[in-house]
Amino acid sequence: MEKIASFTVNHLDLKTGIYVSRKDRLGPITLTTFDLRFTKPNTEPVMVTAGIHSIEHLGATFLRNHPKWKDNVIYFGPMGCRTRFYLILAGDLTSSDIIGLLCELADYVLGYEGEIPGYSPRDCGNYLDNNLDMAKYYMRKYKSEVLDNPTEDRLNYPQ
């Protein structure tokens, strides 16, 4: 079998960042998959599931309710490697196109207080696995490393 595109990226040179992982055509619509890389692969510890899970719930809620972007949100969720999230949006987009959206998302998570949306046994299959403080830690780190000063090496995969 042919190696899939995401396995051809040199993870040894990869930094935290906002990367276009792939673009797919669905009829007349382009779907852009973003790799929101929160930790440096194989160097930093992977994210703990409770923090990831909290970002997933808050992120999905924020993005699917965003006045400008909600109709373009296809998917937001973590990857199994626990170093990143995937964000799939309708549109032929670049990493630079979504910096503002991700800054708003970061501010939402960092300012969030109270019960996390969807955390009940009725609404979530693993509702006890959450940690808002850890989610804020990861988001603060991502904002500082990537969003506050988005350089080219954090917006485009290394060659």
Provide a role label for each language-model segment.
Residues 1-63:
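His/Glu-rich zincin catalytic helix
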Residues 22-25, 37, 64, 82-84, ...:
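Arginine residue identity/basic-tract feature
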